Amino acid sequence: MNLQNPKKFKLLIDQAHQVAINVLRPISRKYDKAEHSYPKELDMLASLVDGMNEGGEGMNAGAAIGKRGTNEQGNKNGVNLSTALSVIEMCYGDTALLLSMPRQGLGNSAIAAVANEEQLELFKNTWAAMAITEPNCGSDSAAIRTTAIKDGEDYILNGEKIFVTSGDRADAIVVWATMDKKLGRSAI
């Protein structure tokens, strides 16, 4: 088994490492101290990453959008490795800042992972926050108490969330809820 990074990803890995050193690390401590301030420096970086994702050079959460194969082709997972490698490098700079980047964080990852083609198009270029953490159960997805009950074409949400990542700045929020508490994670 070859555990070396593929040569075709070297440039991407190098670029992500440069972002970690030259963009994320220099502002990391500043936003640790001012944790409720919005890191405006990330807007330019997010635009750059958006452009790379559009060009097929996936670098983060939005990279998987539009990169799925047909049923005949099977799932195209090549973008997953490039995304993982770039995220590893950028976490060297600051993981929290990386997850705070517009359109690249946890909510967008959830959309990229499970949305159908219509939903992918609907939420393209949308900054999505993620609401998973609940009082008394933390972020344990199997323990989620918030429910989503189908009501015609809609779902009625009932529950409480805390610590919504990027919730005050995002355009949309992905809410983790269960459709059947007895089924645990498989009903989310």
Question: Residues of each region from the PLM?
Answer:
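Amphipathic, small/basic residue-rich leader segments at the start of a protein or domain
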Residues: 1-101, 122
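Long, well-ordered alpha-helical segments
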Residues: 16-27, 115-121, 152-158, 188
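Helix-loop "lid/cap" segments that line or gate small-molecule binding pockets
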Residues: 105-114
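A short, Trp-centered hydrophobic/proline-enriched beta-strand micro-motif
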Residues: 125-134
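Hydrophobic, small-residue-rich alpha-helical packing segments that form membrane-like cores
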Residues: 134-140, 155
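Short acidic, glycine/serine/threonine-rich loops at helix termini
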Residues: 140-144, 167-170
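A structural signal for short hydrophobic beta-strand segments in well-ordered beta-sheet cores
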Residues: 148-149
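A short core secondary-structure module
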Residues: 154, 160-188
